[in-house]
């Protein structure tokens, strides 16, 4: 598990900055375009800074959804619900794709005290598998944004 932070702020420059620490720069640009196109949330006039806490370099696409939820949280100036975990690959058409080891990710999150999970529908466990954890299965980016 990794923590993803984001800061979104009004840009004073003609070209807003996109800074990604621990994440590929081009991936961030693509995710922001998907957020605009399929989530209806534009950040074209905002500076966007994303940081993976602890200096960890994230290579896998499972971090896509957490990145966009962190951006949304900063943009709204409101934190996600306490003890929320998320994972999922975000496709160019706004679909949330399953990722490898979904079951293991949920087990690990539960052992760390997470009470709410936003996951791809393809990674959703059977109902009641995780007592004490509300697992929200999503197929589209818009659904994930509504769950926040």
What is each model feature region?
Residues 1-148:
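Peripheral, non-AAA+ core regions of ATP-driven protein-machinery
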